[in-house]
Structures are given as structure tokens and as C-alpha cells.
Swiss-Prot record:
Record-stated family: Belongs to the NodA family.
Reported function: N-acyltransferase required for nodulation. Acts in the production of a small, heat-stable compound (Nod) that stimulates mitosis in various plant protoplasts.
Annotated keywords: Acyltransferase, Cytoplasm, Nodulation, Plasmid, Transferase
GO molecular function, one term: acyltransferase activity
UniProt subcellular location: Cytoplasm; Cell envelope
Organism: Rhizobium etli (strain ATCC 51251 / DSM 11541 / JCM 21823 / NBRC 15573 / CFN 42)
Gene name per UniProt: nodA
Main location group: cytoplasm
Cellular component GO terms, alphabetical: cell envelope; cytosol
Cysteine-cysteine disulfides: none
Protein name per its UniProtKB record: Nodulation protein A
EC number(s) on file: 2.3.1.-
Domain of life from the UniProt record: Bacteria
InterPro entries registered for this protein in UniProt: NodA, Nodulation_prot_NodA_CS
Keyword Plastid (UniProt): no
Length: 195
């Protein structure tokens, strides 16, 4: 039986310190099993990894945070085209709830329409390919492979270049337009840190 999840949409400025602390704990427990390094950004009460979200969609159940997705409007460059998008990041479902079909996209999609963007996108690691394909089977999104995303690092380090380029699986959600309106190009310039 699917657990009862209640969803909350909130702007970043609406979060209290206790919210950040609870979310940081959620991310450590959700991302930690995928590799200790993945949980490092969420030390203390830090509830973001790179860029901070503008909006958050948070699912709660009787045990606390059950699921999360962060949203951030930004301009990216796809090939030669500048495009206002909503980046989706900080996706997560608490490990004990995986496989129950908890999906925030039915909550996120109307929010994306209100934000006035034509596309939402998120980049995920190759290891999550099957999960993303399941997420997109309802036809709301298209999976693009062979796309590189160049981002700035969240912090500047003397021993590292200021940008990195990653081969990711890109999930693109057309919002009130057609997927054919997505510009062609195999490089996306994020011009900022990933969400």
C-alpha cells in the first residue's frame, strides 16, 4: 500500500532553520547510500549542494520528509540559443519509500506552468538511467542522452578549474510547448553551479 504523503510548495525564503536541518538530514540519509561523498554537502543544516533552489516541493509523511525536489529558474545556453528554463534538482525519495511510486511531478508541473518557463530540465548520473526512464514513461518528459552540461563549481578552489563539464542524462519537460521547440545542441552552458 502506498504511504500517505502530503505535499508542500514553498519559496526558499519561507524555510525556517528547523526546515533546513530536517532537509539536510533527509539528504544525508537519501544520498549517503549512493556514496559518502554525495552526502558531504549536507553537513549541519545545509539543505543545498550547489546553487540554492528558488522553490521547493517537499513531501511529508508520518516520519518526516519523504521526498523533495528543488526548482530554480535560470537562463542556460543550449547550442547557440539562450533559453529561460526551470532547473530541477535535489531530487530524492527517502530510501524506505523507494518503489512506492511517490512522484512529485504531479505537484511540480502546475508550479512550472505558473513560473512561466517553456521547459524544465534536470541532469542525472548515468547510474540513475532506469529510474529516470520509469519517471518519464507517462510522456511528460523526454530523456536526452549524449548531452554535456558545463557548470561552474559552487566554490572556487586553487587546485581545480572553475568549471566542469559532465556527460549526464538530461530529462526535459516541455511546459505549454512542444519538445520540438527545444534547441538542438549537445552542450548546455549552465553559467552557474548545478542545483
Amino acid at each position: 500500500m502506498s504511504p500517505q504523503v502530503r505535499w508542500k510548495v514553498c519559496w526558499e525564503n519561507e524555510l525556517e532553520l528547523s526546515d533546513h536541518t530536517e532537509l539536510a538530514d533527509f539528504f544525508r540519509k537519501t544520498y549517503g547510500p549512493t556514496g559518502a561523498y554525495n552526502a558531504l554537502p549536507f553537513e549541519g543544516a545545509r539543505s543545498w549542494s550547489g546553487a540554492r533552489p528558488e522553490l521547493r516541493v517537499i513531501g511529508y509523511d508520518a516520519h518526516g520528509v519523504a521526498a523533495h525536489m528543488g526548482l530554480l529558474r535560470r537562463f542556460v545556453r543550449v547550442g547557440e540559443v539562450d533559453l529561460l528554463v526551470c532547473e530541477l534538482g535535489l531530487w530524492g525519495v527517502r530510501p524506505d519509500l523507494e518503489g512506492y511510486g511517490i512522484n512529485s511531478m504531479r505537484i511540480v508541473y502546475p508550479v512550472l506552468q505558473q513560473l512561466g518557463v517553456r521547459f524544465a530540465f534536470g541532469g542525472v548520473r548515468q547510474a540513475l538511467r532506469n529510474l529516470v526512464l520509469r519517471l518519464c514513461r507517462n510522456g511528460l518528459a523526454t530523456v536526452l542522452e549524449g548531452v554535456r552540461v558545463r557548470s561552474t563549481l559552487a566554490d572556487v578552489y586553487l587546485n581545480l578549474p572553475p568549471t566542469r563539464c559532465e556527460n549526464v542524462i538530461l530529462v526535459v519537460f516541455p511546459i505549454g510547448c512542444s519538445m520540438s521547440d527545444w534547441p538542438s545542441g549537445t552542450l548546455i552552458e549552465r553559467n552557474g553551479p548545478e542545483l
